[in-house]
Curated annotation (Swiss-Prot):
Chain's role: An essential GTPase which binds GTP, GDP and possibly (p)ppGpp with moderate affinity, with high nucleotide exchange rates and a fairly low GTP hydrolysis rate. Plays a role in control of the cell cycle, stress response, ribosome biogenesis and in those bacteria that undergo differentiation, in morphogenesis control.
Species assigned in the record: Pelobacter propionicus (strain DSM 2379 / NBRC 103807 / OttBd1)
Residues annotated to bind GTP: 166-173, 191-195, 213-216, 283-286, 312-314
Enzyme Commission no: 3.6.5.-
Family, as annotated: Belongs to the TRAFAC class OBG-HflX-like GTPase superfamily. OBG GTPase family.
Cofactor: Mg(2+)
Any one GO biological process: ribosome biogenesis
Binding site for Mg(2+): 173, 193
Quaternary assembly: Monomer.
UniProt keyword Hydrolase, yes or no: yes
Entry protein name: GTPase Obg
Gene: obg
Compartmental location: Cytoplasm
Main location group: cytoplasm
Domain Obg: 1-159
């Protein structure tokens, strides 16, 4: 399925049904009193977060959504039925905003969470409601109240405990493939990952956490360069970030400058995102050139108070220690096998 994480929706709640003008007409009763019923309430527009949904694709194909109108009242004091609510199911993690003002209206972060965003119009009162001692035969009724309309912006932010961050081809997809059942495309060229993917990572004692892989970040990403800028928002809910650094290209490229460039892009995109806990991971430890440069790189980070975790997704070396560090940061302790 194509991954769609943003969509604009034009939604309308239902108009209320009209009240009825009617009078009793029975044998031997020539001039019966008013008995027009009330109109029914219009349907609401309701959003529900549903586990199992992973994209807003279906809503992109149906941008105009309208709840049912309330039914009109009838004679003999019969009230109109309420219009059916329009229930729109969205992935967990969907944020709904007013497309015009940008105001956030709802953040559906839990499975089953529901919110009524647009209320249906009230039904109009029938003429039976307006009879009085001085006005016994009212020949008017209320129209139904109009429903509400809104232009909404829906934005999906993936729900993950751990987010992967780094340049294109830094080894993010290889890592998530190694430790989870996720199968993103992997190749030896930039931007093989063109959409976010989630993987459930099993840990010790049947515990697990969710990891998100997004396209690599390049310089200028906060201004729209590359692919990663579109997907940085998917890291905003992550508890911690793994910043993957590939040092195998030294000296052709400077991995330390690249690390600082990615950190800069993160800060310019969102200072709050940049302030999240980060774990620095040196990838491709199975390559000889990585091992040759590791001590130099480790020293640079340690001088800045940053511990690094060298790993190889190909052989699994260092991966267990990295998972223990993730567990310690997520849950405050490392699990022991039993």
């Amino acid at each position: 399925m194509k991954f769609i994480d943003e969509v604009t929706l034009f939604a309308s709640s239902g108009h209320g049904g009209a009240g009825c003008v009617a009078f009793r007409r029975e044998k031997f009763i020539e001039f019966g009193g008013p008995n027009g019923g009330d109109g029914g309430k219009g349907g609401d527009v309701v959003f529900v977060a549903k586990a199992g949904l992973s994209s807003l694709l279906e809503l992109r194909h149906r941008p105009h959504q309208k709840a049912e109108k309330g039914h009109n009242g009838q004679g003999k004091n019969r009230h109109g039925a309420s219009g059916a609510d329009l229930v729109i199911k969205v992935p967990v993690g969907t944020v709904i905003s007013d497309a015009e003002s940008g105001e956030q209206l709802a953040d559906l972060a839990e499975n089953g969470q529901r919110v009524v965003l647009l209320k249906g119009g009230r039904g109009g009162q029938g003429n039976a409601r307006f009879a009085s001692a001085t006005h016994k035969t009212p020949r008017f009724a209320q129209p139904g109240e109009e429903g509400q309309e809104a232009k909404l912006r829906l934005e999906l932010k993936l729900m993950a405990d751990v987010g992967l961050l780094g340049l294109p081809n830094a080894g993010k997809s290889s890592l998530i493939t190694k430790i989870s059942a996720a199968r993103p495309k992997i190749a030896d060229y930039p931007f093989t990952t063109i959409k976010p993917s989630l993987g459930v990572v099993p840990y010790k004692n049947a515990r697990s956490f969710v990891m998100a892989d997004i396209p690599g970040i390049i310089e200028g990403a906060h201004e729209g360069a590359g692919l990663g800028h579109r997907f940085l928002k998917h890291l905003e809910r992550s508890g911690i970030l793994l910043h993957l650094v590939d040092i195998s290209w030294m000296p052709e490229r400077d991995p330390l400058a690249e690390y600082e460039a990615v950190t800069r892009e993160l800060t310019m995109f969102s200072p709050e995102l940049a302030a999240k806990e980060q774990v620095v991971v040196i990838t491709k430890l199975d390559l000889p050139q990585t091992r040759e440069k590791l001590a130099e790189i480790r020293s640079w980070f340690e001088e800045r108070g940053i511990r690094v975790f060298p790993i190889s997704s190909a052989t699994g070396e260092g991966v267990g220690e990295l998972l223990d560090e993730i567990a310690r940061r997520l849950w405050g302790r490392i699990e022991e096998e039993w």
